[in-house]
Amino acid sequence: DAVSWYISPPNSRSATTQVYWQPGDGKKPARRGETSAVLDQSGKEVSTRETRGGFFLYRFHFDLHYMPVIWARYLVGVAAMFMLVAILSGIITHKKIFTDFFMLRFGKGQRSWLDAHNVTAVIALPFHLMITFTGLVTLAVLYMPWGIAANYAQTSTYQEAVFGKTEEVARSGQPAPLAALGPVMQSASAHWGGKRVGYLRVTNPGDATAMISVTRAPEGAIGSRGEEVTFNGVTGKPVGQSMAKGAALATESVMIGLHAGRFAEYGLRWLYFLSGLGGTIMVGSGLVLWTVKRRTKLPDPSRPHFGFRLVEKLNIATIAGFPAGIAAYFLANRLLPLDLAERADHEINSLFLTWLAVFVWALVRPSARAWPEMLGLVAVLFAAVPLVNAFTTARGLPASLLAGDWLFVSFDLVMLALAAGFAKGAHKAARKRVEAPRTTRRKPQEAMTA
């Protein structure tokens, strides 16, 4: 009795077929897993653990969590606009932006932090601009709906003008077998010159009014809105195709495609990842520099006021807390019982509970002690991910290397690299805490000598 099916066939990133369906009669499933299935190459359902995996992190970056989606997207939009303004104003005000790119001095204290901030900001500057601006474009209609309201009486009229009129046909109540999907996919692929099928949408399956819409995969095309061919769901014959994109729709499609990066091959995906990591370092080093520079200007740097202390605590919660939550999320995926009720929700809750725990720890501990403690915790958690993965599954790093499964190899190696980076940060923070009292005691002697 499903109203529609959504089918994603196997591709270079997945060996299984993903199937989702919309229940009929307005029914709403209690959980997402109740309206989805994973099929192997023979069409049999594969039993998988209940998880939202990386899809949650993808949705979290613009939908947040524990709050209505609409308000979350407004908050994300405000933050993205501030970021875009900060990047543009930074380019204008930073006179030595390209000169500083070649200045990276190690072991120079605050100077090294500033160099790291400048280098990570400049080296991926085109990416920072692109990802921020295109992120705003993806939700531009939500943030600026007035153009549509001023020119179209109804939103549906606008959608028909831009995307083409698509009439939803109600069920006739007359049963009819669905056409074989294999020949339909082959026909669509041939229409696109051999390009791969991205996904299929079947409306009114099992009814005489059934329709099959086949959308092209984004491979080889930056635009996010692939071409579409529609077939009669009973006869399997083509009955229509998507209209040619106008300039505005084509531009929007490219902007969203650049932001999502689904068109990218592995090399470009790694560049996206490393650029994003550089942006994270840029923000993190900026947060640390802000407190370091302002501490020296306080009346009594050893006893900062409440506002300054709060910023330090929030920095620890952000720089150490969120990565700790991510690592805990990965560990929960492997350690929670497979038959646990609402398992996917417990995985997500583990992320936020860990993040909260780090924040509470930062509140009750002196910042100088909390920094090495929490950075060390993050290092341990990330290092534990590949170890737990090896002991709880057949996808451990040695097994993945022998099998040539570079997707799992890359993931485990990235976890170990992050662990090493946070361990280095914990060591630096601990050494700085030990050296600080010595420096304080030495200053009066230096003053007397002078």
Where do the model's predicted regions map?
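Internal alpha-helical transmembrane segments
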Residues: 70-155
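Long, internal scaffold/assembly segments composed of regular secondary structure
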Residues: 177-274, 279-281
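Alpha-helical transmembrane segments forming the membrane-embedded cores
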Residues: 127, 132-174, 303-433
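Non-transmembrane, extracytosolic/lumenal segments of membrane-associated proteins
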Residues: 1-29, 145-223
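Extended, hydrophilic extramembrane loops/domains of integral membrane proteins
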Residues: 23-62, 219-256, 281-288
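Hydrophobic transmembrane alpha-helix segments characteristic of membrane transport
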Residues: 53-56, 89-112, 234-259, 295
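Membrane-water interface of transmembrane alpha-helices
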Residues: 87-100, 278-298
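Short, highly charged, low-complexity non-transmembrane loops/tails of multi-pass membrane proteins
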Residues: 429-450
